[in-house]
Design a protein with these regions (language model features):
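Short alpha-helical patches at coil-to-helix transitions and adjacent helical residues
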Residues: 33, 116-120, 229
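Acidic/His- and Gly-rich active-site-bordering loop/insert found
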Residues: 2-103
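Midchain, well-structured core segments that form catalytic/ion-binding scaffolds
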Residues: 23, 94-97, 101-106, 110, ...
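Short secondary-structure junction motifs
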Residues: 27, 134-136, 242-244
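Active-site metal-coordination/substrate-binding segment of hydrolases
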Residues: 65-147, 152-163
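Buried hydrophobic packing segments
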Residues: 36, 120-127, 232-236
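Structural signal for hydrophobic packing residues in well-ordered secondary-structure cores
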Residues: 20, 40, 44, 81, ...
């Protein structure tokens, strides 16, 4: 039974649940891209899928809106996939396990992919509807936004005529946001010299930091939440003032835009 079947608007949550059932991690979006193409073809809509996997779907204007400017609805099909250590899931082959608690939707011990699955769901609901008046629509769903906006950077626009674009990737329903969050990725290589441990009676210990709030770097970065990597670094520095220690390995984080918790 569908977990979100009773939520309104039904069409939006129907498509969101379908999307959640299809693996769509960044750089692994072929299945969701093909799903969008099949959706369009089943409804005899114009569709173009490029070599990157970006999908463009067009729907003609409804009666009375033929002369209105063309509007683009834009979102991305990929999601950030993260899980707790005790969750067994293969993001490349399995969909998400959805949980509905009151009016809150979350996934069982994984990220949900509401960013930006809800945009795709809204767009599909509008494309499928016969009772929503609208101008001519161009729905542009890109790949690999979460790892550098690679799909948007590589898409060609020869067949796009939209005068207005609505990017469906903000956080607050009912509000229009003018602006965006930027991002920068840096790769640092630090030369190190390995040395043998010369302590008399060394004891190997493992330290871990978890249970923090985490969050999305595009929204929560300004809230000054604790970062597990930084917290661990400060802890090691404090220990170093009181004990003779050697660092064997430090490891933390898998996604650039997921605040380490």
């Amino acid at each position: 039974m569908a977990v979100l079947a009773q939520l309104e608007p039904k069409a939006v949550f129907h498509y969101f649940e379908e999307i959640c059932g299809i693996p769509h991690e960044s750089s692994d979006t072929q299945a969701i891209s093909d799903y969008l193409v099949a959706f369009a073809k089943e409804r005899n809509l114009y569709v173009r899928q490029d070599t990157l996997g970006n999908v463009i779907i067009k729907k003609p204007a409804t009666s009375g809106y033929e002369d209105a400017p063309v509007v683009m609805l834009q979102g991305h099909m990929d999601m950030v996939c993260e899980k707790t250590d005790d969750k067994e899931i293969d993001f490349h082959t399995q969909g998400l396990d959805l949980v509905l608690e009151g009016n809150v939707i979350h996934a069982d011990r994984t990220t949900l992919g509401g960013d930006d699955g809800i945009a795709v769901a809204f767009a599909l609901a509008i494309l499928d509807a016969s009772d929503i008046p609208h101008p001519a629509l161009e729905v542009v769903i890109t790949v690999d936004e979460e790892i550098g906006m690679l799909g948007a950077a590589g898409i060609t626009t020869d067949d796009l005529q939209a005068s207005y674009m609505l990017n469906l990737d903000s956080e607050d329903e009912g509000q229009l946001l003018v602006g965006c969050a930027g991002g920068m990725t840096a790769v640092c290589h630090m030369p190190i010299v390995w040395e043998a441990c010369n302590l008399m009676h060394p004891v190997c210990m493992q330290l871990s930091v978890d249970g923090l709030l985490g969050g999305h770097s595009g929204m929560e970065i300004i809230k000054q939440r604790a970062n597990a990597n930084k917290t661990l670094g400060r802890t090691l520095k404090a220990i170093q003032t009181a004990a003779d220690i050697r660092l064997v390995l430090i490891d933390g984080g898998k996604k650039d835009n997921c605040l380490l918790y």
